[in-house]
C-alpha cells in the first residue's frame, strides 16, 4: 500500500524559479518576475535586508546575548531553557551554550515518535555537556487522538500538534523556574523560506480545538495547550524572551555537522527534521502524495539563497528519492500500526480532499496572521514567525541589551 503515486493534481503549467528550486507544484501561490525569479526569493531578500544581522555586528550581538543570559540567571540553577530535538540546529545551539558557559535546562518533548538515532544523539549531547535534562513524556493516547483528528480533518499542518506542545512546555518550564530566556534553534540558513499554505500558525487554539472537537474521540486531560494570547502573556507579563543564537553566527551547515560529529559523536538524519519517525513519514509520504508538497524544496532553497550550495547542486539533491523502497515500507508499516489503522483505513484518509485550516474557526490573531501571509506582508514559516517575535519583544534582538 506504500505507493508514492501522487493524489494531488497540479493544474498550473510547470515552471521553476530561475534562482532557487521552488516551482509551481503544490497549493502555494507563486509568481515570477521578468527574469524568472520567484516571489519567495524576493521575500527572502527583503527579510535579509530588514532583519538579518550584518556580519560586522554578529560577534558583538552574540556576546551581548550571552552576557544578558548569564546575568539573568545569576543565583539560579539555570540561566535559560533550550529545547533539544537532536537535530542539527538545536544540537548546535547546545554546543554553543556549552562553549560559552551557559547553564541551560535542556527540555525535550517525547511524543513517542523519536527515532533511535535521535535518542542516541540527545543522550550523547547530555552526557558530553553535563546539562540538566527534563524529558516531558506526553500522554500517547491523547497525542495520538490529536494527530488522528488532524489526519481525518485533511488539513496540511499535522505538525501543529507537536510544535504547539513544544512551545507550551518550554514556556511552562521557564516560567515555573523563573527563567527569562528560551534558546531557539531556528536557522536562517535553512528555515527562512516557507511557501504560503505549506504550514499553519502553531498556537491557534480555536483552530486546534475545533479540529479536535469534530474529529477527535478522546477528552484532552493533560495535553499541553498554549494559544496566541498565552504567548503574549509569557512575553509581556512574565518577561520571557527568545534568543536565536544561530542568527548571530555565520557557520555553514556542513561545518556545524562536522563540529557535532567531532564533539558529540552526533550522526546525521535522512533529511532535515527527520529526528521524528512521524515527521520523516509526513514529509516523505503524506505531504507529497496528498498535498503536492516537497518540503525539501524550501529547506534547500534557503541553502541556495544563503550560498551554502549552488542551484545546480540543489536540483541534483532534489532528484534523489526521499525514501528507498525499503525505508518507505518500514515507515509506512510502523506509522499505520502505531496509529491503529489498517493500510486501507489510512489510504481512505489520504484520499480525502485537502481542507484549508481556515475552514475551521480561528483565533482573531491567527486569522490576521494567515491573512498577512496571503497578502505577502510577512514570510510564512516557523523561523520567520519567531524571528519577528524576537525582534519586537526582546531587547537582545534590537541590540539594546
Residue ranges, per PLM feature:
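Nucleotide-activated chemistry modules centered on ATP-dependent adenylation/adenylyltransferase
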Residues: 1-80, 96-401
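Short, glycine-rich nucleotide/cofactor-binding loops
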Residues: 80-89
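Hydrophobic positions on the alpha1 helix immediately C-terminal to the Walker A/P-loop
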Residues: 92-93
Amino acid at each position: 500500500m506504500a505507493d508514492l503515486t501522487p493524489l494531488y493534481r497540479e493544474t498550473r503549467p510547470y515552471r521553476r524559479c530561475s534562482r532557487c528550486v521552488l516551482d509551481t507544484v503544490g497549493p502555494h501561490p507563486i509568481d515570477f518576475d521578468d527574469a524568472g525569479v520567484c516571489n519567495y526569493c524576493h521575500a527572502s531578500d527583503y527579510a535579509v535586508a530588514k532583519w538579518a544581522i550584518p556580519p560586522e555586528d554578529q560577534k558583538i550581538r552574540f556576546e551581548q546575548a550571552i552576557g544578558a543570559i548569564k546575568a539573568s540567571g545569576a543565583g539560579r540553577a539555570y540561566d535559560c531553557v533550550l529545547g533539544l530535538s537532536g537535530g542539527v540546529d538545536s544540537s548546535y545551539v547546545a554546543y554553543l551554550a556549552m562553549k560559552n558557559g551557559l547553564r541551560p535546562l535542556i527540555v525535550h518533548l517525547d511524543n513517542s515518535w523519536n527515532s533511535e538515532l535521535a535518542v542516541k544523539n540527545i543522550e550523547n549531547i547530555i552526557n558530553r555537556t553535563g546539562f540538566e535534562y527534563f524529558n516531558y513524556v506526553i500522554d500517547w493516547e491523547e497525542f495520538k487522538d490529536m494527530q488522528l483528528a488532524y489526519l481525518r480533518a485533511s488539513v496540511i499542518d499535522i505538525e501543529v500538534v507537536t510544535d504547539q506542545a513544544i512551545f507550551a512546555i518550554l514556556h511552562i518550564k521557564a516560567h515555573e523556574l523563573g527563567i527569562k530566556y528560551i534558546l531557539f534553534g531556528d536557522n536562517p540558513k535553512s528555515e527562512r523560506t516557507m511557501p504560503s499554505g505549506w504550514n499553519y500558525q502553531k498556537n491557534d487554539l480555536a483552530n486546534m480545538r475545533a479540529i479536535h472537537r469534530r474529529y477527535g474521540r478522546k477528552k484532552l486531560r493533560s495535553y499541553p495547550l498554549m494559544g496566541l494570547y498565552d504567548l503574549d502573556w509569557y512575553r509581556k507579563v512574565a518577561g520571557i524572551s527568545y534568543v536565536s543564537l544561530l542568527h548571530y553566527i555565520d557557520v555553514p551547515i556542513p561545518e556545524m555537522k562536522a563540529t557535532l560529529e567531532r564533539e558529540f559523536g552526533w550522526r546525521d538524519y535522512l533529511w532535515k527534521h527527520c529526528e521524528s519517525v512521524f515527521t520523516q513519514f509526513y514529509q516523505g509520504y503524506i505531504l507529497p502524495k496528498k498535498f503536492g508538497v516537497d518540503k525539501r524544496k524550501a529547506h534547500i532553497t534557503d541553502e541556495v539563497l544563503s550560498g551554502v550550495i549552488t542551484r545546480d547542486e540543489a536540483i541534483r539533491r532534489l532528484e534523489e528519492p526521499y525514501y528507498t523502497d525499503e525505508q518507505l515500507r518500514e515507515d509506512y508499516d510502523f506509522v499505520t500500526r502505531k496509529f491503529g489503522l489498517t493500510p486501507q483505513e489510512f489510504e481512505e484518509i489520504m484520499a480525502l480532499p485537502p481542507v484549508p485550516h481556515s475552514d475551521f474557526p480561528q483565533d482573531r490573531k491567527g486569522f490576521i496572521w494567515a491573512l498577512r501571509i496571503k497578502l505577502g506582508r510577512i514570510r510564512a514559516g516557523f523561523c520567520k514567525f519567531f524571528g519577528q517575535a524576537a525582534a519586537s519583544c526582546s531587547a537582545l534582538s534590537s541590540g539594546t541589551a
